[in-house]
Each structure stands twice: as C-alpha cells, then as structure tokens.
Amino acid sequence: MANSFAARIFTTLSDLQTNMANLKVIGIVIGKTDVKGFPDRKNIGSERYTFSFTIRDSPAHFVNAASWGNEDYIKSLSDSFRVGDCVIIENPLIQRKEIEREEKFSPATPSNCKLLLSENHSTVKVCSSYEVDTKLLSLIHLPVKESHDYYSLGDIVANGHSLNGRIINVLAAVKSVGEPKYFTTSDRRKGQRCEVRLYDETESSFAMTCWDNESILLAQSWMPRETVIFASDVRINFDKFRNCMTATVISKTIITTNPDIPEANILLNFIRENKETNVLDDEIDSYFKESINLSTIVDVYTVEQLKGKALKNEGKADPSYGILYAYISTLNIDDETTKVVRNRCSSCGYIVNEASNMCTTCNKNSLDFKSVFLSFHVLIDLTDHTGTLHSCSLTGSVAEETLGCTFVLSHRARSGLKISVLSCKLADPTEASRNLSGQKHV
C-alpha cells in the first residue's frame, strides 16, 4: 500500500465484498474508456452518460469501476484523471460482477466485484506523486497478463486469417504514432482515430488503430523507436482493403507502457541495436495502407502546387490528400510483366520472392505451401498545364477500375516523390475548368 498510514485507512482491492459501505480504496489507473451517452429510459428525450476505468493496488489485484450520471458530472469526473494517475475513491458501491456479460466489453479482472460511483455519495481524488508509495506507482509498468502470454507480430502475420476476429495480447515496439484524425459520422457523432505502427524482431511494420480518445492520448506519449508496449486484449482482424493483419484497441484493452518484464527488455535491446542502422528493410508504408474516406478530400491542386507542397512538407510524416485534374501521360503496361504485377501470398498478403515464388514468412516454419495471387503495381505519369508528376502509384482496386482488370492491392513505389492514386475517373470538362481557375492550395 501507499504507506503505513494508508494501510490503516484504505481497504485493499483483495478484501472487497459486496455491500461494503463507507470505505476508501486507493489504486493506480491502468485503463480508462471514453465518456458515452445513452438515451435515458426513465426520462424520454434526455441522455445518461457513463465511463469506466480500471484501478490496481497490487500485482495480483485490480478491479473495474464505472460511473453514471448527467453529462456535466460524468465529463468533469472523467477529465479529472488519466491513465497512470493514482486515485483515492471514497464511498463506492461494491457490486458483484456479472462475469460473462461484463467482461465481454470490459477488461477481465481477477476480482468478483466492481465499483460503482454515484454523484451524490462517491468522490474521486487524484494523489500527487509524493503522497504515494513508489511500489504502487510501479504497478503501471506491470502487464495484467502473464509476461509470456503474447503473440509476436510475425506470429500474427504467419497465422493470418486464422486469427481474424480473435482477441489476443501483443508485445511490440512503437515505430511511429500518427496524428489523430477527427471525423463526423452520418448521424452527426464526432469520432477520432489514430494509427500506431508497431514492430519487433519478427516483423518490420504492423498497424494498430486507436478509436477512443483515451488510448489516443496514451499513444501520443509514446516515443517512436524507444517505447515498448504490452497490449492486453486487442482485437486482430484481416483488413481486406490493406490485405494484411491489423490490431484494434477496444474497450477490453489495457496497454502497459514500457512493461517491466524480461521479454520487454530483450525487445528494448533490439530497438537500441537497430535504432541507427534501421536494418528492417521490408517496410510497408503505413499511410498508404490507411483506409481513406474519399468524400473528405476536397482541396484541388495543380501539379505545380503539389510539388511545392511536397517541398514545403519535406520531412513530415503525414501525407497530403487532394484532387488533381490531369491526364495520364504515361501508362507503361507494355513493360516487363514483373514490373506491372507482383505475386502475393494468399495467407499473409505480402509480396513473395520472385525467384522461388514462395512466401518466406509463411513457409519458413511450415511444410505447407501457401498459394500466391497476382497483384497490380503500375507506375503512371500524371500531367496538367503546369507540369508532370512522374511514377505515381496506381494499385489495388483503383487500378482494377481504371484498367478493367481484377487483381488486388499491391505495394507502391518506395523512392522519389510518392503519389498514390486513390480514385481515378473521367472528369467533366466544365467542372475541371471551374476548379482549376483561381485555386490556391499551396
């Protein structure tokens, strides 16, 4: 516990029992969800709000807590603390946990109880670091699952579709953290997403997506090529658009930053040894593999403006999106076949070795031969009245629609100014003329 004084006044999480009253608990916040609103069944036309979090006071004991109330109270309470803070909760209601129903959407905990906070009776206080024993603070670096209970990124890729929809644990290093992107849904709800690229000794780049504000805030604190994370209970899916496996942070997920476990120390040494040399040469561009909402792209550019924008943003990780009215000035489909189409593994979706026609990822530890399929990889030039963009990448479904053939998504070119075509169709001359006149998006 925090200290001898704290040990006398706080109830440990291991001692919690239903219907206990007038108690105080202390713990480190190891997980937290966003505030959500739901229609109030008792008051038609109004909403009730809720959020939940998970606290821990020892290596073996942690519990979920939730609070319901009006919008102002819930948002104020949620904003008062973050993951990593130590909190004191006074007068929570102790209820028995409905394991099967609640752990479907909440983190699995060893306790049979849960805490319910009410506006009228419960309080939450954030402790300053000097008030708390370092043993309690150190719990933030201890995963909630066994240190060996995880998949390597290479294992996930190798298993492919067999892990689709599964909830698993992942230990990996942070390669990059994308900027949060905000959007509004068709029913006018605001949302956000952030993509984190992970890597380890077995895989050079793997996408993990955060959809809630709490996990995005946590991700923004990570240092690329320095931070290691243990992500407990992330959902794994095969992304048909990207043709690869991806991870998603869900409401069950608890992410431990820089976990204090031997496996993480080994990975950390790997990061340090390869930080400067960057020997991982099979990198897949993360932004090209993101799902892009074309309806949100409204800025119109000329070739000259795009080149100027590229020079201005040189060195920045985020891509730029825009509309270009141009004609295809080079479409070299008469080139060697190997430069127009590539073979991909039907299991993991990665490009296979051209000489052996075998996937080194899936077949290196298996006698089962994995089939391959053809994938477009066409480089085109786009030209307008201001200049030409050379070696633009025309791949995937866009290439299929443009060329009238049916292959699937391929990697894009890796050198020079990189342009990816997200949509390609005939432009109305009047519309093109109107948009090209007086546009300034540099």
UniProtKB/Swiss-Prot annotation:
It is an enzyme of class 3 (hydrolase). Keywords: Chromosome, Cytoplasm, Disease variant, DNA-binding, Exonuclease, Hydrolase, Meiosis, Nuclease, Nucleus, Premature ovarian failure. Its EC number is 3.1.-.-. Its main location: cytoplasm. GO terms for molecular function: chromatin binding; single-stranded DNA 3'-5' DNA exonuclease activity; single-stranded DNA binding. It comes from the Eukaryota. Pfam families: OB_MEIOB_N. It is found in: Cytoplasm; Nucleus; Chromosome. GO terms for biological process: double-strand break repair via homologous recombination; female meiosis I; fertilization; homologous chromosome pairing at meiosis; male meiosis I; male meiotic nuclear division; resolution of meiotic recombination intermediates. InterPro entries: MEIOB, NA-bd_OB-fold, OB_MEIOB_N. One of its GO terms (cellular component) is cytoplasm. In fetal gonads, specifically expressed in the ovary starting at the 14th weeks post fertilization. In the adult, restricted to testis. Residues 167-272 bind DNA. Component of a multiprotein complex with RPA2 and SPATA22. Interacts with SPATA22. Interacts with the complex BRME1:HSF2BP:BRCA2. Belongs to the MEIOB family. Single-stranded DNA-binding protein required for homologous recombination in meiosis I. Required for double strand breaks (DSBs) repair and crossover formation and promotion of faithful and complete synapsis. Not required for the initial loading of recombinases but required to maintain a proper number of RAD51 and DMC1 foci after the zygotene stage. May act by ensuring the stabilization of recombinases, which is required for successful homology search and meiotic recombination. Displays Single-stranded DNA 3'-5' exonuclease activity in vitro. It is linked to Spermatogenic failure 22: An infertility disorder caused by spermatogenesis defects that result in non-obstructive azoospermia. This is Meiosis-specific with OB domain-containing protein.
